Amino acid sequence: MKYQQLENLESGWKWKYLVKKHREGELITRYIEASAAQEAVDVLLSLENEPVLVNGWIDKHMNPELVNRMKQTIRARRKRHFNAEHQHTRKKSIDLEFIVWQRLAGLAQRRGKTLSETIVQLIEDAENKEKYANKMSSLKHDLQALLGKE
């Protein structure tokens, strides 16, 4: 396993996940009867500061349909948690309009690069173009000064 599992931390994440799903109206318990489901949810809500007991609640009461989705969510959260420790692996997000993302993805595909590599290439191209324009402007100015003095 690439990322270490931290039981207390992950139990807190599981608790938050289940509470969020409950508030969104999903059935988080295995019980069909509303009173039994509400009773189990009340027990879960009381376990906020008891991360070790959350896993026991999950084994006993959780809706089996949520098992894989919760595992995926926790796995992704664990990855983000450990990647955030290092600057080079920390992910940043940017807001792009869909059409911009689509064009960037197309360019990346044509170049055989990732989106990040394509963005770096575009920045380098823009910087080189700027340097070239400054150099040409400087040469033009020097040439005009040279021709004007003769």
Curated annotation (Swiss-Prot):
Keywords: Cell cycle, Cell division, Cytoplasm, DNA-binding. Its main location: cytoplasm. GO terms for cellular component: cytoplasm. The keyword Cell division applies. It is found in: Cytoplasm. The keyword Protein biosynthesis does not apply. One of its GO terms (biological process) is cell division. One of its GO terms (molecular function) is sequence-specific DNA binding. InterPro entries: Arc_rbn_hlx_hlx, MatP, MatP_C, MatP_N, MatP_N_sf. It comes from the Bacteria. Belongs to the MatP family. Homodimer. Required for spatial organization of the terminus region of the chromosome (Ter macrodomain) during the cell cycle. Prevents early segregation of duplicated Ter macrodomains during cell division. Binds specifically to matS, which is a 13 bp signature motif repeated within the Ter macrodomain. This is Macrodomain Ter protein. It comes from Escherichia coli O139:H28 (strain E24377A / ETEC). The gene is matP.
